[in-house]
Amino acid sequence: MSSEPTNPSASREAAHNAPTEVQPPKGIGAMAGAMFLMATSAIGPGFLTQTSVFTVQMGAAFAFAIALSIIVDIAIQLNVWRVLAISGMRANELGNTVLPGLGWFLAILVFIGGMVFNIGNIAGSGLGLNAMLGIDARIGGLIASAIAIFIFLSKRAGVALDRIVAALGAIMILLMLYVAIVSQPPVGEALKNTVMPESVDFFVITTLIGGTVGGYITFAGAHRLIDSGLSGPENVNAITKTSVLGIIITGIMRVLLFLAVLGVVSTGVALSEDNTACLLYTS
């Protein structure tokens, strides 16, 4: 009667590692989190104001500017995300590799820009709560800031962020779709101007591009992929898909907002100077 020696620690290790091999959902969650983080970073108060004001200024011809900016946005973001995520290095790390000190200079610029943009985001969240609940915009900004701080203080902030931005992004698109349908915009005129615009303003196009992939916005999604471990040449297809889908989500939101505003202003309603976003939900 023979008995083979056993290694209890090896058995325990094998038993412990067996259930952890189911990784696809985590990868999918990281991809969704990255693209929605990028998209929701782009869709802020400036995004709403730009789209609303430019729609009033240009009318249906603004459709061409949106279409062209989406194409350019895809090219820019695809390039940035591939370089960063495939290398597995954040923008400042890669910059220091190319030229010592360049990464720190880039980080300072992004930090300054991020501070300015997030002051606007806090103000925008306050205006949003003011539009929904009628509370003072300053109190609304404090409430939104407290919620954000609570999320980032969590030990599972990364997982929470992936789920929260994906859920809120989907809700935001559905709400804007509803408003776009209810406002009954002249869709035929918008489609015609997409390929045959009545006027072209390259300043507007440049502004849209900067508001979508400028500053920290495009870095946010790429860095989220790196943080989640979705990097390296072997993940190039997932990186590419996530990059393009992030821009498409932003583009869908801009198109829906454009149609909603176009439908409202085509009836002769004037924009509110104090809270532009409130116009769509109160008209």
Q: Whereabouts are the PLM-identified features?
A:
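Membrane-interface "cap" regions at the ends of multi-pass membrane proteins
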Residues: M1-F47, V204-I205, S231-L245
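Conserved small/polar residues in nucleotide/adenosyl-binding loops
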Residues: Y281-T282
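Juxtamembrane transmembrane-helix boundary signature
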Residues: M38, A65-V98, F105-G113
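Hydrophobic, small-residue-rich membrane helices and short re-entrant helix-turn-helix hairpins
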Residues: Q50-T55, A160, I217-I252, T267-A277
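Hydrophobic alpha-helical segments and their helix-loop junctions in multi-pass secondary transporters
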Residues: G169-V195, I205-H223, A260-L262
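Transmembrane alpha-helical segments of multi-pass small-molecule transport proteins
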Residues: M35, A107-I108, A131-S154, L168-A180
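Selective recognition of specific alpha-helical transmembrane segments in multi-pass small-molecule
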Residues: F64-N79, M172, T240-S266
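Hydrophobic transmembrane alpha-helices that form the core helical bundles
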Residues: I86, G103-G134, G141-S145
